[in-house]
Amino acid sequence: MGRKSFSTNLINSLSVNEETAYKFVEKGLKDLSISRTSFSWGIPVPNNKKHVIYVWLDALTNYISALKFPNTNDKLYQEFWPADLHVIGKDILRFHAIYWPAFLLAAKIDLPKKVYGHGWILSGDEKMSKSKGNILDPIEIINKYGLDSLRYYLIKEVSFGNDGNISQERLEDCINSDLANNFGNLCQRVTAFAIKNCDSKIPKQIEFNEDDHKILNNYKDIIELIREKIDNQDINFYINFIVNSLFEANKYFNDQEPWNKKEDLLRLNTIVFTTLEIVRKVSFLLYPIIPESSIKALKIFNLKENDILLSSITNHEFLKSGSEINSIDILFKKVEKND
């Protein structure tokens, strides 16, 4: 393979991080030495004791040697190579998006289908460092606020692919506004109302009006769009859709005022059913982000982990009328903040 065609193939393999990867290759490929003489530690080059293998050559091969390469018929290799998505830090993007594909192309081995460089998690606009004293210990955070809270906060606040500033104060704000108020409070309110006014059952007689159809139609074509966005690592779209869905659901429940519809049971039942359906849909969507809390929320409907199907998001009558609903414990406690 000539240098020009090799360069073309390499450029074609770079599907993300164009600013870093494309510019490097478009300048023109230069020879890369795969050995070093400036130090002695490393894998010796055969027949030349003065040289050791360049660390980025032998280190990168671990991705396939761990899968039993060169035995390409091994089950591990067959199942996991080529990788659908290879996620690495942006500071080592060049080695993974240029050198590694170059090595694989030269050896006629399949390339990862996509390489994605994530950003850094910053504290006060700086990389975390013990010497600077700006480290947030993830174990301490998890012990204090819970794993789901930290996971949700990072996914929502750190735009995938970019650097993101985090702080304990912002985490607490996120827990209070999104998880405790928007999600947890909605689950508690509609469940308590249904237990009291619908005999602890999913309402039987319902009749959707324009307001109900409007909010339910937000989920009409969402499945394919979500799949497309996730395939392109657009996590922001996914989380923002959930946040907006919860905002709309709370607004719907407040605006419809089911507590003032006790003389119109058909309307009351429909409002409760619609809100419960949205709680179910959003709990399904939240499962990849806050799995433990989502499963707790689904106990309202006696649903379990294996009942979670993305395809059912568009089904507006997934819940079985007349089936029992249960009260649940508080999903997220509000964080008391000292003024």
Tell me what each language-model feature is.
Residues M1-K196, Y238-I242:
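Structured secondary-structure scaffolds
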Residues T8-S13, N48, N71-F80, D199-N217, ...:
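Short, glycine- and charge-enriched coil/turn segments that flank and shape catalytic ligand pockets
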Residues S15, E19, K23, D173, ...:
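An alpha-helix initiation/capping motif
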Residues A59-N62, N182-F193, N218, L225, ...:
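Alpha-helical scaffold segments in carbohydrate-active enzymes
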Residues L93, L154-E157, G161, S167-R170, ...:
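Active-site-proximal binding-pocket segments
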Residues D110-L111, S149, I202, S294, ...:
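Residue-level detector of short coil/turn "hinge" positions at structural boundaries
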Residues G119-I121, R170-L171, K204-E210, K299-L303:
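A glycine-rich phosphate-binding loop feature that marks nucleotide/adenosyl-phosphate handling sites
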Residues E228, Q233, V243, F247-D339:
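Basic, alpha-helical terminal appendages of large translation-related enzymes
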